Amino acid sequence: MKNRIAKKVCAAALAGLMTMALVPTSVFAAGTMTIGVTSFADTLEPTEQYFSWVISRYGVGQGLTKFDEEGNMVPCLATEWTNSEDGKTWTFTIREGVKFSNGNDMTPELVKASLERTIEMSNRVPEFFDIDSIEVDGQNIIFNLNRANANMAGCLADPLFLIMDTSIDNSNIAMDGPVCTGPYAFQSFDPSGDTVVVRNEYYWDGDVPNDSVTL
């Protein structure tokens, strides 16, 4: 069990580091940038295989938590979290004032809907936790688990649990990509060619270094 948890933590940490590597804070001036990549996605549906990692690495997807460059667990779309003594109830406070890249507010209700979509559609979720239900209580999201999980915050740092806007038509998400909260948003996607992401004008966490990035 400990080895499985450690692997999940390392995987989530790597995903967070890849995202930060794509989005430097002060190296590049505004404009366009081209980055060569060796790993591509067949689809931008985040629940398919491990393609959520690509979505996060491209600076589009974000989750409730993340790992910093030193491997420390830090807040992202959640500002804080607590757990019950039995480890079966986890409460995450959702960051206020965050918008998706289309300008829609990221509400706790939409966070819940996004997570429930992932839980319903991905067969990888049981590798992380055994969920009973998710509730909204004001600005909080409450996870009710069937079994105790001491590493719930680490599990949610995995890109699989990125938060996307489920209030819009996502019928063509495989090509359009999810609408998320990261510094960039998808402009175009070619599974056998280039992918272009553009600056998210609603980004909540500081300046975005480039107008667009071609990958």
What does each model-identified segment do?
Residues K2-A13:
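Bacterial N-terminal signal peptides that target proteins for export
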Residues L14-L22:
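Hydrophobic core
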Residues L22-T32:
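Sec-dependent signal peptide cleavage junction
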Residues A30-F40, T89-F92, V111-S114, I141-F143, ...:
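Short, well-ordered beta-strand elements
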Residues G36-E85, V179-C180:
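N-terminal lobe/hinge region of extracytoplasmic solute-binding protein
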Residues T79-M121, I142:
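Aromatic- and charge-enriched surface segment that lines or borders ligand/interaction sites
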Residues P126-S167, S188-D190:
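Surface-exposed binding/hinge segments that line
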Residues A157-V208, S212:
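Gly/Pro-rich hinge or "lid" segments in bacterial periplasmic/extracellular proteins
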